[in-house]
Swiss-Prot record:
There is a cross-link at residues 27, 184, 212, 225, 238, 271, 337, 436, 439, 443, 567, 579, 588, 622, 638, 669, 709, 717, 757, 759, 772, 841, 901 (Glycyl lysine isopeptide (Lys-Gly) (interchain with G-Cter in SUMO2)). The keyword Nucleus applies. GTF2I-like repeats lie at residues 119-213, 342-436, 556-650, 681-775, 805-899, 908-1002. It is found in: Nucleus. Residues 1021-1043 have a biased composition (Low complexity). This is General transcription factor II-I repeat domain-containing protein 1. The modification Phosphoserine is found at residue 448. It comes from Mus musculus (Mouse). The lineage of its organism: Eukaryota, Metazoa, Chordata, Craniata, Vertebrata. Keywords: Developmental protein, DNA-binding, Isopeptide bond, Nucleus, Phosphoprotein, Repeat, Transcription, Transcription regulation, Ubl conjugation. A motif (Nuclear localization signal) lies at residues 1012-1019. The keyword Transcription applies. GO terms for biological process: transcription by RNA polymerase II; transition between slow and fast fiber.
Length: 1104
């Protein structure tokens, strides 16, 4: 069960457990039992698809119960719990509690209860102990009035307990070393650290004179969030007022230690609450006046990213994150004790904070400083020659930690001890003279007042830096307006030294030895990187002055540098591409086509390490390198047909380009939000295009693995939940298989570059292997000149049977598994330790030569290609009992050993290829059979009917040594031969095998073996009803040809294909509409060309 906030865990007075009596114990047990029963009822209701949300209040405790959705709802709506608690408490809400203490109510029963924050989330006891140790050190330092953290001398304080008084510890806990607490006690201390205060009774150097004094522990009532600051008036402190140190404020300590992820509405709520009920010394009942010495403010505790806390007394929420100092020790501890913690940590925010601390610390080391300095990411991106980053893992570009995912963050932390910054020289002076915001400098237009500019810049910064660390200090936050930093920054600050504000500008006179230039950063972070650090800040100006309203220097900003370079590279690419396709004017390069076909379309002469991408994706360094190598760049087009859609987009002509350049020169400073927004949109379009291409690639490869010619939607979730069922080969190193929407542009391009190598292999079937076919919409018209209307066809008109479609891939895989089983058993029967290909034809000719035992009773042994899916499943279930015994040798043993097709490796290599070829041959035969029937669509070939009547259909164009039969019986060599001769294959229908109406109304016209058993009866009944109705109609009405659903049809079959006009119905004039029920329109069909025997073959076509 989740208890509300943190006020529900501690009794209101500092009374020990000896004051509890049996009445309260029995009452608590009864409440726990009833709440557990209530939770069990919620669990039962959830199984009936009923959602329940329940809040129970008992004294100081709040129980949250219900189904999963109900508990999530209540835990996201904390105000509902608070309101209900206030309502139940009534006017006694703000009154001090003087009665018996209320025991903490925790519902241990009921497995669906939401656990309280922490033991499950922070299972590392060592980490908890270090966090509590940090809390005690900070409180002790504040009690001593020190600005830096002083380790707490546990031995001396425990030996002389009169030196220190501790207030606010949870009920029943005494002050001792953190290592002596159990995990629950450690979590209780961390959750209520904002109430704990240390007080020095005498200076530490006085000696242990008062050894009889005990460490004072005074329980403090923890009130709910809504009135926690207002409800402390009645709390009498047991400590002398003059003894309390003013610096030991719980709010500053909490802001100093912890990082929390608080939603925006919570932050705004706290901002509204705090001013209405400020926490003053008089409210606490402490008579000491407001101190004059400096009290650390929220600005003093700005972290390395310039964030400010949400409020001066913001509470700790349930999810307690590790303190920044613990994260600092994780980053800098040389031992391996933190490596398991890094590998198991999945919280992306904690990992990003660790990497942020790592980068800031290493950058400070490179500057020769002893405290963290924010890394100027955008400066490094715009001027990469100034700073070199050494030790970052391969294929991970240096950029903001907030842009990394969990795998890359872990890889960086694993190499944390080898990562270093090398300062080569000072940054470009033009970067130093830019403005403090992350966007390009914005010039004030004459009609734009400073207030509008401030609002626009603030909005611009919010759009670009939401969710990341702010790059400006507290003075910039004040200029941007109140509440901006708190609403955007979701993390509590880390403490830095106050003097760090004065070292923003860094000048390095003696650069270290140079090394190779670092890889230029990706475009994803260039327009949104930080340019606020390392800039000159006018220290002599007051906070009310707006630094961006003063005049700008004449030098160009980084945006002014990179934009012309991008335009020049864009023009260079367009010109070279136009030269390659043979046009005189520049033509826009179809970058996506070059990415999709890297072997047929590529570029030569690009600098080393630079591939063809849009110029917006390059930084300044790479753009300059491309321009330097402009004479050697050449576009190579091996297959011009791939560019048919891309050559129709000429770029602007010379006059338009000149006018555009003049327009840009006239307004060089109007870049701001709109331009960066357009740049961001272009990057989004590129990424979306790449994702669609990768999605299509995966769908195509998955369809090929299933033996289907059309792309099939990849079931990512089902593949993930069935590991090993689908094997994906050929992906670039370091890129796992997952949804394309989770990849960045760089990984998407890498995937597309190896598209030909990617291969899907389905090893075993699972539910949802193939998605269900969708119903198709067909537009039909019954008469010429009539308005066509859409109608929804029956699913089996154009698609295979639904069950077969769903299990098509499963049948193919099951068949191959049974083959492998038989090969394995045959090899064992021969005394070999490997599978041997079973000679099914020899066994069929000599059935007594091999005896197969262990098969299900109703299944004979034969080629697995002839089994249906049910028999295949039965055989696989009984695979442990299947055994072969060779009675008579069918083939020489040397031939078995030397057969190149026998080894398992050869079969496994050709398994996927054989499945694909087999399906392609099936599609070829279906297509040719449909053409022979005069239809413009494939029709399923009735192989069994043709086998029973081999003279009914003549197949021409097959290779000489290959007879026509079901493609399942062909080996891979014959399948390849048939596909090579596909242009010559042709079918001629000599004798009609089945009613033409069945062919037209059902795309699947298999033999009975291919029809599911549960549908055979329905099909046969339908045929009999149709036959009886037609016969009775023809006998009773002489004009039955015009009034029934069946019409005679004559089909030509003289060595040539049927023409559609000879078999498709033509409208007949009729005297009047038919009134017979169930009849449709009246059609007459004539095909008068005789067959080779001079006979006409009637067909039957039902009409609708």
């Amino acid at each position: 069960m989740a208890l509300l906030g943190k006020h529900c865990d501690i009794p209101t007075n500092g009374c020990g457990s000896e004051r509890w009596n049996s009445t309260f114990a029995r009452k608590d047990e009864l409440i726990n039992s009833l709440v557990s029963a209530l939770d069990s009822m919620c669990s039962a209701l959830s199984k009936l698809n009923t959602e329940v949300a329940c809040v129970a209040v008992h004294n100081e405790s709040v129980f949250v119960m219900g189904t999963e959705k109900g508990r999530v709802f209540l835990n996201t709506r904390k105000e509902l719990q608070s309101d209900f608690l206030r309502f139940c408490r009534g006017p006694l809400w703000n009154d001090p509690e003087a009665g018996h203490p209320k025991k903490v109510q925790r519902c241990e029963g009921g497995g669906r209860s939401l656990p309280r924050s922490s033991l499950e989330q922070c299972s590392d006891v060592y980490l908890l102990q270090k966090m509590v140790e940090e809390v005690f050190d900070v409180l002790y330092s504040e009690a001593m009035g020190r600005a830096t953290v002083v380790p707490l001398p546990y031995e001396r304080l425990l030996r002389e307990p009169g030196l220190l008084a501790v207030q606010g510890l949870p009920e029943g806990l005494a002050f001792r070393r953190p290592a002596e607490y159990d995990p629950k006690a450690l979590m209780a201390i961390l959750e209520h650290s904002h109430r704990i205060r240390f007080k020095l009774r005498r200076p530490p150097d006085d000696g242990g004179q008062d050894t009889k004094a005990l460490v004072e522990m005074n329980g403090i009532s923890l009130l709910p969030k809504g009135s926690r600051d207002c409800g402390l008036h009645g709390q009498a402190s047991k400590v002398a007022p003059q003894d309390l140190t003013p610096t030991a404020t719980p709010s500053s300590m909490a802001n100093f230690l912890y990082s929390t992820s608080m939603p925006n509405h919570t932050i705004r709520e706290l901002k509204q609450e705090v001013p209405t009920c400020p926490l003053t010394p008089s409210d606490l009942g402490m008579g000491w006046p407001v101190p004059e010495p400096h009290v650390p403010s929220t600005q003093d505790f700005s972290d390395c990213c310039g964030q400010t806390p949400a409020g001066p007394a913001g509470p700790l929420i349930q999810n307690v994150h590790a303190s920044k100092r613990i994260l600092f020790s994780i980053v800098h501890d040389k031992s391996e004790k933190w490596d398991p913690f890094i590998k198991e940590m999945e919280d992306i925010n904690t990992l990003r904070e660790c990497v942020q601390i790592l980068f800031n610390s290493r950058y400070a080391e490179a500057l020769g400083l002893d405290h963290m300095v924010p890394v100027p990411y955008r400066k490094i991106a715009c001027d990469p020659e100034a700073v070199e980053i050494v030790g970052i893992p391969d294929k991970i570009p240096f950029k903001r930690p907030c842009t990394y995912g969990v795998p890359k963050l872990k890889r960086i932390l694993e190499e944390r001890h080898s990562i270093h910054f090398i300062i080569k020289r000072m940054f470009d002076e033009r970067i130093f003279t830019g403005n403090k915001f992350t966007k390009d400098p914005m010039k004030l237009e004459p009609a734009s007042p400073p207030e509008d500019t401030s609002t626009e810049v603030c909005r611009d910064s919010m759009l670009d830096l939401a969710g990341t660390a702010w790059s400006d200090m507290s003075s910039v936050s004040e200029d941007c307006g109140p509440g901006t930093s708190g609403e955007i920054a979701m993390l509590r600050p880390i403490k830095i030294e106050p003097e760090e504000l004065d070292i923003i500008q860094v000048t390095v006179s003696d650069p270290s030895p140079t090394s190779e230039e670092m890889t230029d950063s990706l475009p994803g972070h260039l327009p949104s990187e930080d340019s606020g650090y390392g800039m000159e800040m006018p220290a002599d100006k007051g906070p009310s002055e707006e630094p961006w309203s003063e005049e700008r220097p004449a030098e160009e900003s980084p945006g002014d540098v990179i934009r012309p370079l991008r335009k020049q590279v864009e023009m260079l690419f367009n010109t070279k591409y136009a030269k390659a396709i043979g046009t005189s004017e520049p033509v826009k390069v179809p970058y996506s086509k070059f990415l999709m076909h890297p072997e047929e379309l590529f570029v030569l002469g690009l600098p080393e390490g630079i591939s063809l991408r849009r110029p917006n994706c390059f930084g300044i360094a790479k753009l300059r390198k491309i321009l330097e190598a402009s004479n050697s760049i050449q576009f190579v087009i091996k297959r011009p047909e791939l560019l048919t859609d891309g050559v129709k987009e000429p770029v602007l002509d010379t006059q338009e380009r000149d006018s555009w350049d003049r327009l840009v020169d006239e307004t060089p400073k109007r870049q701001g939000l709109q331009e960066n927004y357009n740049t961001r949109l272009s990057r989004i379009d590129i990424a979306n295009t790449l994702r669609e291409q990768v999605q299509d690639l995966f769908n195509k490869k998955y369809g090929e693995a299933l033996g289907i010619k059309y792309p099939v939607q990849v079931p990512y979730k089902r593949i993930k939940s069935n590991p090993g069922s689908v094997i994906i080969e050929g992906l670039p190193p370091g890129i796992p298989f997952r949804k394309p929407c989770t990849f960045g542009s760089q990984n998407l391009e890498r995937i597309l570059s190896v598209a030909d190598k990617i291969k899907f292999t389905v090893t075993r079937p699972f539910q949802g292997l193939i998605p269900k076919p969708e119903t198709k919409i067909l537009t039909t018209g019954h008469e010429a000149g009539k308005t066509t209307r859409p109608r929804r066809l029956q699913q089996d008109t154009w698609q295979p049977d639904e069950d077969d479609a769903n299990r098509l891939g499963e049948k193919v895989i099951l068949r191959e598994q049974v083959k492998e089983l038989f090969n394995e058993k045959y090899g064992e029967a021969l005394g070999l330790n490997r599978p041997v290909l079973v000679p099914y034809k020899l066994i069929r000719d000599s059935p007594d030569a091999v005896e197969v035992k262990g098969l299900p009773d109703d299944i004979p042994f034969r080629n697995p290609n002839t089994y249906d899916i049910h028999r295949l499943e039965k055989i696989l279930k009984a695979r442990e009992h299947v055994r072969m015994v060779i009675i008579n040798q069918l083939q020489p043993f040397a031939e078995v050993c030397n057969d190149p097709k026998v080894p398992e490796e050869d079969d496994s290599n050709k398994l996927g290829k054989k499945v694909i070829l087999r399906e392609q041959v099936k599609e070829l035969f279906n297509e040719k059979y449909g053409e022979a029937l005069g239809l413009n669509r494939p029709v399923l070939v009735p192989y069994k009917l043709i086998r029973d009547s081999p003279d009914a259909v003549e197949v021409k164009g097959l290779p000489d040594d290959i007879p026509f039969r079901n493609p399942n019986t062909y080996d891979i060599h014959r399948l390849e031969k048939i596909l090579k001769a596909r242009e010559h294959v042709r079918m001629v229908i000599i004798n009609q095998l089945q009613p033409f109406g069945d062919v037209c109304n059902n795309a699947k016209v298999p033999a009975k073996d291919n029809i599911p058993k549960r549908k055979r009866k329905r099909v046969s009944e339908g045929n009999s009803v149709s036959s009886s109705s037609s016969s009775s109609s023809s006998s009773s009405n002489p004009e039955s040809v015009a009034s029934t659903n069946q019409i005679s049809l004559v089909v030509k079959s003289r060595g040539s294909e049927l023409h559609p006009n000879s078999v498709w119905p033509l409208p007949l004039p009729r005297a009047g509409p038919s009134t017979a029920p169930g009849t449709g329109r009246h059609w007459a069909l004539r095909g008068t060309q005789p067959t080779t025997e001079g006979q006409a073959h009637p067909l039957v076509l039902p009409t609708r």
